[in-house]
Amino acid sequence: MINALSNRSGYPCLSQNIYLNQASLGLLSDKTVTEMTKFLDTVARYGNLKMTDEEEAHFLNPLRRNVATLLQAKQKNIAIVASASEILSQIPELCKPKRNSKVILVSTDFPAITRPWLGSAKTRGFEICFVHEIPEADLTQSLIEKIDSNTSIVCVSYVQFASGTRIDVKELSQHTKKMGVKLVIDVTQAAGAIPININDWDLDILVCSGYKWLGGHGGIAIGWLSDEILELEPPTIGWFGNENPFEMDATKLNLSKTAAKYTQSTLSYISVVGLNAAIEQLLEISILEIMKHSDKLAQQLFSNLLYSEWKSFRPITSREFSSHIISLMHPSGDAIKSTFEQLSENGLICGIRNGRLRVSISHYNNGNDIKYLGAALHHE
């Protein structure tokens, strides 16, 4: 049997349930919860008795260091914010696409990525070009084919939340760079599950939520901004983005020269502590080993489903296949809903996205989880 990479006892719900849904609301480990509770009990409840202004001004630094390690980036380029949408919603104003130029999006991407552009297009007058993802086509190539001299921005997820399709960001970034097109990548469904080296990509902005594969709680997210983007002022400025947030002269603006200027205000510090602990745990396990683990379990699942009616949106042989998010199709749409409900009743939690069964494989999953899922799907 394929054993879990992490200690399953650190996730109490796994004693009674099979959780294949980290792509939605991710599980929090005992270590993460312990650190969050410790902070709440020993610091947060005591206000400034336990945290001075100077300590608060530097409170995000440990998380910033770990995020930089995770992405193999420089700390000065790392932004800590309350949500991925906090950055995504500013990008249309930050990048200012020209009137009548083209912004390329994926029509089935997560709405947080597309909706800021849809709203901005009404007033800025640029064109939205939706690329449609289909199983028979390579999504990376479909995106590249739409890039032309009139394109201003490409904004897309590294891994699609519903299908698990993983685009080739390096290849895409080579084309956007050549054409003078800005590239924005959301790695929410990738960071923590597959290795990311920001130096391999030539992009402008990266964003990521903290409550899925990174193992944190809601209310905290991360971003990376290129040196070129850092030369610009954030469209939305908060008090905490100042070089020294606690210099309280309300008549002066002295923004940080780093991505710290994107932190707008007091964050959920308990979520900061939780995400920092969760990322430390992931780094200890090794992101590469986590990816290899999901590869093995995905292979097991495909072997179990070999003679069933269930088929993956992306075949395992596809270069765009992601082993940690598997989107399963069935000839009968009713079978998908009924199977999902039956699995849930029996304590196996997965998801339905875009009319398909979505299976998320994490480091705490083992061969028995996949065996149970395979057997249940064969009964349909």
Where on the chain are the PLM-derived regions?
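Pyridoxal 5′-phosphate
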Residues: M1-E380
